[in-house]
Design a protein with these regions (language model features):
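A short tyrosine-centered beta-strand micro-motif
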Residues: 74, 143, 147, 267-275
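Membrane-proximal extracellular "stem/stalk" segments
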Residues: 184-315
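Short beta-strand elements of extracellular/lumenal beta-sandwich folds
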Residues: 52-72, 132, 201-214
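N-terminal edge beta-strand
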Residues: 30-59, 187-189, 198
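Short acidic, flexible loop segments centered on an aromatic residue
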Residues: 76-87, 92-101, 149-150, 216-232
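Short, solvent-exposed loop/turn segments enriched in Ser/Thr/Gly
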Residues: 46, 57-63, 126-128, 140-146, ...
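Intrinsically disordered, low-complexity Pro/Gly/Ser/Thr-rich segments with frequent PxxP/GP/PP motifs
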Residues: 98-138, 231-264
Length: 363
């Protein structure tokens, strides 16, 4: 067991949509354990993940020992992915990218072959083989990714979740890092700034600046300082600073600049950004535009923006008061008219009565 505890293996919690109940699951609930079998061509034998030096066109089979200490068979589904960089500037080895980076020539999923699933019998262990077929052309730098090992969800598990009324489950997986290289040629990291666009993170307005690592090498200890102004002006509207980030080889991520609850306003803006990594500095100054349609759409769904629809209720209230006043005025006018007519009738009646009295006296 001591050997297993020394493994540098990433535990990844895969969460589905939550509606009713969030359950807490820890590593002890996993029904299997893993141990990479480190081969002779490991660049550093002290590392407990795969960090292999190979040659172009070479083929090699590596193995991971899967141990099942439970009294039931366990079905494990392996998956291989190239490393990517998430929105927080952290390298992910077990996540599936929405879209492969344009500079990534060799995807690990195309280079490494593994079975779709493997059965590990109860109280036993199985060695899972993975075959690596290196590209024919030699490349500088590294290929980096991860081998995700997750237990297959059975129909019984699904039924139990349904009976318990759960809409969420914490599904954990082991992710073993895999790094491949062919030579020791020095690679100088290079970053590029791509699209700048308004978007949202967790239902909050941000302006995303897409940063891309176009080299086959990690960018370590990355710090970013960004500020946004109106085009042609100096007043800083939004700003963001981050340190200690890392980018995977040939990957990109959207660096979010928060608006801190402010409304997006249509117009022309300027982004000024500086990135630093181990003594190397990049600086960009780019103009971009936010159109009215995008601003309105995002403002409606930003949970931090105060609802300014109160004026509608105020308008309705004022309208009702005006209607009430108009109705009161009409009714008052009618009443006054009736009173005036009644007064005139009464005066006319008095006059007639008075005339009759005069005639009677004359007689």
């Amino acid at each position: 067991m001591k050997k297993y505890t020394k493994l540098i293996i990433f535990m990844v919690a895969l969460l589905t949509t939550s509606t009713f109940l969030i359950t807490k699951v820890n590593a002890s609930e996993l029904n299997f354990s893993v141990e990479p079998i480190i081969p002779a061509n490991q660049r550093d034998q002290k590392k407990t993940y795969f960090d292999l030096k190979m040659e172009a066109s070479a083929s090699q089979t590596i193995e991971i020992n899967l141990r099942n200490d439970t009294k039931n068979d366990v079905i494990i589904q392996p998956r291989v992915n190239s490393a990517l960089t998430n929105i927080k500037g952290v390298v992910e080895y077990g996540e599936l990218p929405e879209k492969q980076d344009s500079t990534l020539i060799h995807n690990l999923n195309d280079i490494v072959t593994v079975v779709d699933e493997v059965i590990v019998p109860a109280e036993s262990h199985v060695r899972l083989p993975l075959t690596i077929d290196m590209p024919k052309e030699e490349f500088d730098g590294i290929l980096a990714g991860g081998i995700t090992l997750q237990e297959k969800q059975t129909d019984t598990d699904t039924n139990k979740k349904g009976e318990q009324g759960l809409s969420i489950q914490n599904r954990y997986a082991y992710v073993v890092a895999l790094v491949l290289n062919e030579n020791d040629n020095e690679i100088v990291p290079e970053l590029e700034l791509n699209e700048i666009a308004a978007a949202q993170v967790n239902a909050r307005n941000v302006i995303n600046a897409n940063l891309q690592n176009i080299t086959a090498m990690y960018v370590n200890q990355l710090s970013v300082n960004a500020k946004i102004t109106r085009q042609g002006q100096n007043e800083v509207l939004y700003k963001s600073t981050s340190e200690g980030m890392q980018m995977a080889p040939n990957s990109n991520f959207n660096y979010p600049i928060s608006l801190d609850g402010a409304k997006l306003e249509a117009g022309k803006y300027t982004l000024e950004m500086t990135a630093e990594s181990k003594g190397k500095t990049w600086h960009w100054k780019e103009n971009f535009t936010i159109d009215g349609e995008t601003a309105n759409k995002l403002n409606k769904t930003d949970v931090t923006i105060e609802n300014n629809s109160n004026w509608i209720y105020i308008l309705i209230g004022v309208s009702l008061i005006l209607v009430a006043l108009i109705l009161w005025f009409i009714l008052w006018k009618r009443k006054k008219k009736k009173e005036e007519e009644a007064r005139k009738k009464e005066l006319a009646a008095r006059k007639r009565k008075k005339k009759k009295s005069v005639k009677t006296e004359k007689k």
